[in-house]
């Protein structure tokens, strides 16, 4: 079942975060995931999300976890987590009951 990684965060240290995007792009490309949306000026409808929102599409939740836990991603994830404040979730695609 298709799964989505959704991250919403505020950048707290722009200089520390700056190398993250160029480093993550080739890792994402190697997984075959699809970047559905990425916005540095997210507009809140409810609550207090960060200004950055990213939505990634994976073939399955297992594929999403494989990317997240891969040695390649784990080597750079700190560039995001150390320099931002926010959330990231991995969710299954929803299909209405028949």
Residue ranges and their predicted role:
Residues 52-54, 86-87:
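Generic beta-strand structural signal
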Residues 1-52, 59-69, 74, 92-98:
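Short S/T/G/P-rich N-terminal loop/turn motif that feeds into the first structured element of a domain
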Residues 72-90:
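Short arginine-rich
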């Amino acid at each position: 079942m298709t799964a989505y990684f959704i991250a919403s965060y505020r950048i707290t240290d722009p200089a520390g975060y700056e190398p993250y995007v160029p480093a993550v792009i080739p890792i994402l490309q190697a997984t075959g995931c699809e970047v559905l949306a990425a916005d540095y000026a997210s507009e809140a409808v409810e609550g207090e999300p960060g200004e950055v929102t990213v939505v990634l599409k994976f073939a399955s939740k297992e594929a999403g976890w494989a990317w997240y836990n891969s040695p390649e991603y784990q080597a750079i994830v700190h560039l995001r987590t150390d320099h931002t404040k926010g959330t990231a979730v991995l969710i299954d695609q929803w299909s209405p009951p028949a």
